A protein has these predicted regions:
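NAD(P)+-binding Rossmann beta1-loop-alpha1 motif at the extreme N-terminus of oxidoreductases
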Residues: 1-52, 121
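Intrinsic-disorder/low-complexity, polar/charged segments
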Residues: 12, 95-98, 245
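Internal alpha-helical scaffold of NAD(P)-dependent oxidoreductase catalytic cores
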Residues: 103-105, 145-264
Length: 265
């Protein structure tokens, strides 16, 4: 059964959309006017590297089974959709228009699946025993998340990496690390059925080449554990996020080993 899926953010969101379109779903991307105009006219294109092939394959949304549209945050009727994907960087959700859309999404009770680097605050509230109020300072504007039910928010590990190639149109994305999205389940099994259908659709996707159909990387893997999408955070907290100091930059190895006991903690 095709779903109607609302994705906030067309940059990283195009990668997720390119995989979901294989299931015949309709994707609506919330993005900037210039991006929306290009996507509505030409679709979007994702260059995806394949192991064993010298050149990446090109996923053209106009040639995929589903359909895609794009537009601004204003005027979106959230009641039309079955699932929301949160694909923007965390500070962008406080932007005018996006903030109001987020409130409407939260109040609608729609299930939300995040591929943000920063775990949404409602997702963190699914972990018992955390001091949620103390976490609010880590967010640009924690009030953006007030309308969301934690049980209806889940998270993907943002493992796949992609860039907008310099000098290319705004509807082109280049995947640089084609790893999998690892998604935690929702509390409600009704919404998990959507996730598992999408997981199957992405797994079954094949790309036509002169040598025949090939399997594509960047899967959607559904996991029962809330902790799976946070697997990279130990590395980030012990290494990457401690590379910038008041005295300047240092490499990840030095960040970890400068105080090994703190890193272990």
């Amino acid at each position: 059964m095709p779903y109607k899926i609302l994705l906030l953010g067309a940059s990283y969101g195009s990668l997720l959309a390119s995989k979901l379109l294989y299931g015949g779903h309709h994707i609506h991307l919330v993005c900037l006017p210039e991006e929306a105009k290009l996507i509505n006219t030409e679709g979007f294109k994702v260059r995806l590297p394949i192991r064993g092939r010298a050149e990446p394959v090109l996923l053209d949304s106009q040639r995929l089974p589903g359909s895609v549209s794009a537009g601004p945050a204003e005027g979106v009727d959230v009641k039309q959709f079955d699932l929301v994907g949160l694909c923007m960087q965390e500070p962008q959700y406080r932007s005018p228009g996006v903030r109001e859309l987020m409130k409407a999404i939260g109040e609608s009770g729609l299930p939300c699946m995040s591929i943000m680097n920063m775990p949404p605050l409602p997702y963190m509230k699914r972990f018992p025993g955390l001091d949620y109020k103390s976490l609010e300072a880590a967010y640009t504007d924690a009030r953006v998340w007030d309308a969301f039910d934690p049980n209806k928010v889940t998270l993907n590990s943002p493992d796949p990496q992609a860039i907008r190639p310099p000098g290319e149109p705004a509807n082109v994305l280049q995947v640089t690390l084609p790893t999998n999205f690892k998604c935690a389940t929702f509390v409600d099994e009704k919404y998990n059925q959507i996730l598992r259908q999408l997981e199957t659709d992405v797994a079954n996707a094949r790309f036509d080449t002169p040598e025949g159909k090939i399997e594509l990387p960047v899967k959607l893997k559904v996991h029962e554990s809330l902790f799976v999408p946070l697997a990279k955070w130990a590395m980030l907290l012990a290494g990457n996020y401690r590379c910038v100091t008041t005295d300047g930059m240092r490499n990840t190895q030095d960040a970890v080993h400068a105080d090994i006991e703190q890193s272990r903690s």
